[in-house]
Amino acid sequence: DWLKAGINVNLSYQKYNTTTFGTEANSVYNKAYAARIYRPDQTINEILTDEEGNFTGYGKRLDYFDDMGYYNPYYLAELQPNDRSTVRINGNTFFNINPIKGLNIRTSQAVDAFDYRNSHKAYPEGPFEGAGVASESFERYYSFTFTNTAEYKFSLSDKHLFTVLAGQESIITKNENFSATSKKMVDSRMMLMAAGAESEVPIHSMYDKVFNSYFGTISYSFADRYYVDLAARRDGSSLFAKNNQWANFYSLGAMWDMRKENFLQNVSWLNSLQLKVSYGTTGNSGISAYNALALVGSGLLYNGQPGIAPSTVGNDNLTWESMKTLNVGISTRVFDRFSVELEFYNRQTDDMLMGYPLSYTTGHGSSVENVASMRNRGFDITLGVDILKTRDFSWSVSGNLNYNKNEITKLFNGLDEYTLPDTGLKMKVGKPWGEYYYVKWAGVDPRDGYNTWYDKNGNLTKSYSEEDAVFVGKQRYAPWSGGFGTQFGWKGISVSADFSFMLGQYMLNNERFFTENPTFAGSDNQTVEML
C-alpha cells in the first residue's frame, strides 16, 4: 500500500462537414420578422402555378432565393465543401508514495493535445466571384501539466491536528497554426493546392507560454471546533514583462463550529451553527501571449512583395491583476429541517488587465495594460427546507439570493472617466461598470413626426448630439440574481426542478431596430407602434 500508480488516456477522432457560409440563411428568428414578406411556407423548391396563378405543387429545388437574396445552404454545401477533422488526446498519470505514516508524496502529469485540419474548396463552376479556390489550414496544440506535492498529517494530542502541504506545479502550453490558399483552379476534379495558377501568402503563427507555481498550506484544528487554514503561493507567468513575471499571493481562513461548544450541547433543536471568516489575495493572468513584447508581424504585402510591420506595442510594466477578498459568513441548521447560510464579501480588484486605447498615429489601436481598479461588495444567502421526509419519500425546496454592488475605483492615466466608442458604455470612477451611457429619446413630436431628445441638461431638442449622452441609471449586469428549486425522491428515484433569475439587468432590444424602422419596411415586418 505504500506505492500507488495509475494512468488514464482518452483518444477521440471527430470528422464533420460544414458550409463556408454556415449562417447564410441567417438567424432562425428572422422568419418571425419576414415570413409574410418572403415565403410563408418556408419551402426551398420552385412553386408551380397554373395559368390563373393557382398553386399546383412544387418543382425543382431552388439554389438561389431571389426574394431573399440568399443561396440555398444545400447548394453551398455542394459547391463549397468544408471538411474538418480533429484528433484529440487527454491523458494523465500519477505516482503516490507513503514512505512513513502520515506522509503522502504525489507526482502527476497530464496532457491535453489536439491536431486540427480544415480543408476548404470552392469549385470553379460555383456562382461566386473568385471561385476555383482550395485552402488548407492546420492547428496543433498541446498543454502539459506537472504537479508535485508532499503532504504530512500529524497530531500533537487528541485535540491538536495539523496538515502541512508543499507543492510545485508547471503548465507548458504550445500552439501552432498554418494555412495556405491556392486560386484560379479550372477543373473541379483536380482541386489540389498545386493545381492553382496563383497562391496567397501563407499564414504561419505560433506561441508558447509557461506557468510555474510554488505553494504551501497549513491546516490546524483544535478540539474539532476551531479551524485555521493558511496558504501562500508564488506564481510566475511568461505572459508578463520580464521583471514582473512573479507575484506572491496568500490567504487566511478560520471557522468556529459553535454547535460543539458545551454551552450548546443541550440545545436539541440546533443541529449545526458555524461562523467563518477568510481573507486572501489571488492573481489573474488571462491575456494572450506576447502582449508584454514589442513585436513585428508578417503576412503583409507592400507593392506586391511580402513584408513585416510592427504588430504589438509592448509594455515593460505589464504585471499580474490582483484581487483582495474578504468573506464573513454564518451557516446553521435547525429542527433537522431548515438550513440557512449567509455570507458577506468585499472584493477589491487592482491592476485590471484591459485593452488601453492608443492614438492611431502610433500605428496601433490599443495596448494591453494594467489600467483600472474595481470593487464588488455584496452578500449571498441560501435557504433550504426539508418539507417531508419519510422512509420512502422526500420533498425539499431551496433558494438563493445574491446582491452585488459594483464600483469603479480607479482608471488609467489618472482619468476620472472614459467613454468606450460605439458601445453605449462609459467608465467613470464611482459608477458601476456596465451602466449605459446614451442620449435619452423623448419620443416623436406629433405635430411634425420628428424625433425629440433630451439634451444633457434635460431640455427637449430635435437636434441629436452625442455630447448630450448621460448615464441612464440602467446596467447591463444584474445587481440582483438568484434561484430556487425543488426535489422529490421516492425509493431511490429523484426528480428535481431548478430555476434562476436576475433583477436589474437591461439589454438592448436590437430587434426593434428592424421592426420599428421605416428603412426596413420593405424587408421586415413592422410592429403596430409604426402605425
Residue ranges and their predicted role:
Residues 216-232:
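Short, contiguous hydrophobic alpha-helices characteristic of membrane insertion segments
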Residues 213, 247-251:
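Transmembrane beta-barrel architecture of outer membranes
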Residues 2-88, 106-212, 239-241, 258-325, ...:
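Surface-exposed loop/interface segments of Gram-negative outer-membrane beta-barrel transport/assembly proteins
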Residues 396, 475-503:
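Conserved C-terminal beta-signal and adjacent last beta-strands/turns
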Residues 242-246:
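Short glycine/threonine-rich loop-to-helix capping motif typified by GTGT followed
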Residues 228-237, 386:
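Transmembrane beta-strand segments that form the barrel wall of outer-membrane beta-barrel proteins
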